[in-house]
């Protein structure tokens, strides 16, 4: 199996697309299943054992909230 390269991408979604993805994530969390999402051409599998956190950042007039899912591939 080839090693995956480091990657840091951000994708902008419409409100309806974002809501749909959040809904699928919530459903996966409630049922204890892994979550699958494609981001910028790469399919990502988030395991049910992932850890979750919410970050709030402020810099000048800009604010940001990030919902993060973190895990280690085994």
Language-model features and meaning:
Residues 1-2, 74:
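Absolute protein N-terminus
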Residues 52-74:
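C-terminal edge-of-domain segments
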Residues 8-9, 33-55, 59:
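Short, structured protein-protein interaction patches enriched in aromatics and acidic/basic residues
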Residues 2-25, 30:
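N-terminal acidic leader/helix
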Residues 26, 36-42, 61-63, 67-69:
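Short, low-complexity, charged amphipathic interaction modules
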